[in-house]
């Protein structure tokens, strides 16, 4: 944020979080319980939705075929990455690239809208002044879904601030 600017600052990347900066101090309203219980609108959450959509046969057939071609979807391979390897949240987030690539397809559009709405209501709207200050974002999910994010924020009369892919970009 510009120096001493009051703002809500959010992360939408592999994981997600949100805080309020009063110009001097960062305030956290929602205590994160980690990627399994929290992380609305994160790469790991989108990866989880895509895998479930695929395995529960909710994903459109053509999209499912392409998903199979791009990823190893063998159950044993997936379970190994989720339960035996470190950072299962990062593994799940690798599927977010597919979602971003297909963000204009109805199946992915619905997932994106649902998760963004959840993030806005569960995180951003916790702060009473969420309509008065800009909301800045950092992370690849926010960066690559900036247009969708802006539409969702506008729906709730929330002002989108800066959107950066990585902290170093600022």
Residue ranges with predicted function:
Residues 1-65:
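Phosphate-binding/catalytic loop of phosphoryl-transfer enzymes
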Residues 2-8, 51-170:
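ATP-binding/phosphotransfer module of carbohydrate and carboxylate kinases, centering on a glycine-rich
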